[in-house]
UniProtKB/Swiss-Prot annotation:
Entry annotated with the keyword NAD: no
Entry's family note: Belongs to the TACO1 family.
Native source organism of the sequence: Rickettsia conorii (strain ATCC VR-613 / Malish 7)
Main location: cytoplasm
Cellular compartments annotated: Cytoplasm
A GO biological process held by the record: regulation of DNA-templated transcription
GO cellular component terms given for this protein: cytoplasm
Keyword Secreted tagged: no
Annotated region described as Disordered, given as residue ranges: 1-21
Pfam families xref list: TACO1_YebC_N (PF20772), Transcrip_reg (PF01709)
Keywords: Cytoplasm, DNA-binding, Transcription, Transcription regulation
Name this polypeptide is given: Probable transcriptional regulatory protein RC0681
A molecular-function term among this protein's GO annotations: DNA binding
């Protein structure tokens, strides 16, 4: 995972996501409902996916009453709302590989929306499996840099069973095997509290540096449009903005 310390560049700008809190809440609620319905139990103690979903929801300050409502909705036998997990893969301009993870109640609608977004911004949607070999599928847990020293959090990650940690100026990013994700998340939450973010995702094995402002803006617009869909849970790409381009874009209104 070395070389991916600028994690903020890989998954688009967090500030842009924060402005869309209503959509973030919608995505979190879908995951809670799906986890409660598809898991072995609606008790988070016995359902790791639901436990992880609740941790993610709390990290984004999803109100407790909305969490409870989502779980109750999943338990309601008259509720026919079911979501299907789908992964879309394709290329953005300049050979950037993109993975889109979705939870949808209408696969045809979501596929059309995702394909249209790729086409509109100069990309192309491929078959499932066309780019995932360029990524590592793993658990990701993020804490603010001031939560602990690099040494202390590294020791905690090793004890918990995580396999890597990268720290930059603002964030400790911990990586885990998928099978250990829930255990590591629970251990670190007990030690440091709820993380800023936690999920199972696709982290690029290598990144392509984007050092042109126009190319970066077009790429980020594609990511933004994809993320605006209620059906899309997360978007991943094997790109990284150069420091200069990142500073220019961050400084724009």
């Amino acid at each position: 995972m070395a070389g991916h310390s600028k994690f903020k560049n890989i998954q688009h700008r967090k500030g842009a996501q924060d402005k869309k809190r209503a959509k973030v809440f919608t995505k979190l609620i879908r995951e809670i409902v799906t986890a409660a319905k598809t898991g072995s139990s609606n008790n988070p103690e016995n359902n790791p996916r639901l436990r992880n979903a609740l941790t993610a929801a709390r990290s984004q300050n999803l109100p407790k009453e909305r969490i409870d409502k989502a779980i109750n909705s999943a338990n309601d036998s008259s509720n026919n709302e079911n979501y299907t997990e789908i992964r879309y893969e394709g290329y953005a301009p300049n050979g950037i590989a993109i993975i889109v993870e979705a939870l949808t109640d209408n696969k045809n609608r979501t596929a059309a929306e995702v394909r249209s977004s790729f086409t509109k911004y100069g990309g192309s949607l491929g078959e499932t499996g066309s780019v995932n070999y360029l990524f590592n599928h793993c658990g990701v847990i993020q804490y603010p840099i001031n939560i602990a020293s690099n040494k202390d959090i590294l020791e905690a990650v090793i004890e918990a069973g995580g396999h890597d940690i990268i720290s930059d100026d603002t964030t400790h990013t911990i990586y885990t095997d998928i099978e250990n994700f829930s255990k590591v998340l629970e251990f670190l939450t007990g030690k440091y509290g709820i993380p800023e973010d936690s999920y199972i995702g696709w982290i690029p094995l290598n990144t392509i540096i984007i050092d042109d402002k126009e190319k970066a803006e077009k790429l980020l617009k594609l990511v933004e449009v994809l993320e605006e869909s209620d059906d899309v849970q997360r978007v991943f790409g094997n790109y990284e903005l150069s420091d200069d381009v990142y500073e220019i874009i961050q400084g724009e209104p």
